């Protein structure tokens, strides 16, 4: 494996993700066709030098330096591959807003892993990158679909190995994601949850998850509607999202099969048929507007390819 030359550059596209999807807390996530683009370049300097350039309206909220997730992920690749760290510049075209429940942090982790691995000739397998991504993030539901694409169920087996199952998502099932101009940190959303839950609530979630997965596989809206309910995390998190319940109700009244908090929130996911999408989008935006919150609600498809990289040639 050769050290990347000064100026060597790769471009990494990484999709947004929506995690949990109701009952699949910390194990179910899907990639959406909304990408962050990371252009990673070897620059002059030692391995502790890292420069971050953000293109996008919300870049001021992101940190550079040693705490940056792109940098931390790249460092993990150098170490796992037995390579000396190199100085990096990361230019980010930000389309996935941070602290909205759309896996922005996961895009940074995956980009750092994939980009750093590409710069040294891809010595690490995708399975190893997956392991590193989960270790950095602390839970799998965003980083796994961000890396692999599609709808992914991830669980830790009795052997302590992470096992990933790619689940089917019928192409007729569309996602409206209402993204408000308010932020909610994952740590705050996790603090709102209890340490334990009643056994009955866990049983209800298991049944709901089964219905949801079958509904997504077949495109059966009734099954999606019956399955897209949660008792483990959403009852404690809706109160953190200003106008969240109103937005949810507006989506259902406009024809959504089901509605859930996207990840830790505050974005809200509605699943629907394509013909209902525009009306649901408008209804969700209006509902947030009624409580003084600006938002947008794009109609998105499942992104099935996950992250990918390509070399960049200045010529």
UniProtKB/Swiss-Prot annotation:
Where is it localised? Cytoplasm
Entry GO terms, CC: cytoplasm
- Please state the Enzyme Commission number of this protein: 2.7.1.39
Alphabetical list of InterPro entries matching this protein: GHMP_kinase_C_dom, GHMP_kinase_C_sf, GHMP_kinase_N_dom, GHMP_knse_ATP-bd_CS, Homoserine_kinase, Ribosomal_Su5_D2-typ_SF, Ribsml_uS5_D2-typ_fold_subgr
The keyword Chaperone is assigned to this record: no
Query: A Pfam family in this protein?
Result: GHMP_kinases_C
Q: Which HAMAP family match?
A: Homoser_kinase
Q: What is the lineage of its organism?
A: Bacteria, Bacillati, Cyanobacteriota, Cyanophyceae, Synechococcales
Arranged from A to Z, the UniProt key words for this protein are: Amino-acid biosynthesis, ATP-binding, Cytoplasm, Kinase, Nucleotide-binding, Threonine biosynthesis, Transferase
Instruction: List membrane-spanning regions.
Output: none
Which family is this protein grouped under? Belongs to the GHMP kinase family. Homoserine kinase subfamily.
In the record, biological process GO terms are: threonine biosynthetic process
Catalyzed reactions: L-homoserine + ATP = O-phospho-L-homoserine + ADP + H(+)
Please verify whether the record's keywords include Zinc-finger: no
Q: Where does this protein act, in terms of pathway?
A: Amino-acid biosynthesis; L-threonine biosynthesis; L-threonine from L-aspartate: step 4/5
Broad class of the protein's primary localization: cytoplasm
Supply the source organism for this entry. Synechococcus sp. (strain WH7803)
Amino-acid positions noted as binding ATP in the UniProt annotation, renumbered to this chain: 97-107
Q: One MF term in GO for this entry?
A: ATP binding
Q: What does this protein do?
A: Catalyzes the ATP-dependent phosphorylation of L-homoserine to L-homoserine phosphate.
Q: What is this protein called?
A: Homoserine kinase
Question: SUPFAM superfamilies under this entry?
Answer: GHMP Kinase, C-terminal domain, Ribosomal protein S5 domain 2-like
């Amino acid at each position: 494996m050769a050290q990347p030359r000064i100026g060597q550059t790769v471009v990494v596209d990484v999709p947004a993700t929506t995690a949990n999807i109701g009952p699949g807390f910390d194990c179910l996530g899907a990639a959406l066709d909304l990408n962050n683009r990371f252009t990673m370049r070897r620059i002059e300097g030692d391995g502790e030098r890292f420069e971050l350039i953000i293109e996008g309206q919300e870049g001021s909220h992101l940190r550079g330096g040693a705490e940056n997730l792109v940098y931390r992920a790249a460092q993990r690749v150098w170490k796992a591959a037995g390579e000396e760290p190199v100085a990096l510049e990361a230019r980010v075209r930000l389309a996935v807003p941070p602290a909205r429940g759309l896996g922005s942090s996961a895009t940074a982790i995956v980009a750092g892993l994939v980009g750093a691995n590409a710069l040294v000739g891809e010595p690490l397998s995708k399975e190893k990158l997956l392991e590193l991504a989960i270790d950095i993030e602390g839970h799998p539901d965003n980083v796994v679909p961000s890396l692999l694409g599609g709808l992914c169920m991830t669980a830790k087996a009795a052997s302590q190995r992470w096992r990933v199952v790619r689940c089917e998502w019928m192409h007729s099932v569309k996602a409206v994601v209402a993204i408000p101009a308010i932020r909610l940190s994952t740590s705050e959303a996790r603090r709102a949850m209890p340490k334990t839950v009643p056994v009955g609530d866990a049983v209800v979630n298991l049944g709901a998850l089964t219905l949801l997965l079958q509904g997504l596989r077949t495109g059966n809206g009734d099954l999606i509607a019956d399955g897209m309910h949660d008792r483990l995390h959403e009852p404690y998190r809706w109160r953190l999202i200003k106008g969240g319940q109103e937005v949810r109700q507006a989506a259902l009244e406009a024809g959504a099969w089901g509605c859930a908090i996207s990840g830790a929130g505050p974005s809200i996911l509605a699943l629907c048929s394509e013909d209902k999408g525009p009306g649901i989008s408008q209804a969700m935006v209006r509902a947030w507007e009624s409580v003084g919150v600006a938002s947008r609600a794009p109609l998105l498809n499942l992104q099935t390819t996950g992250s990918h990289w390509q070399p960049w040639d200045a010529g």
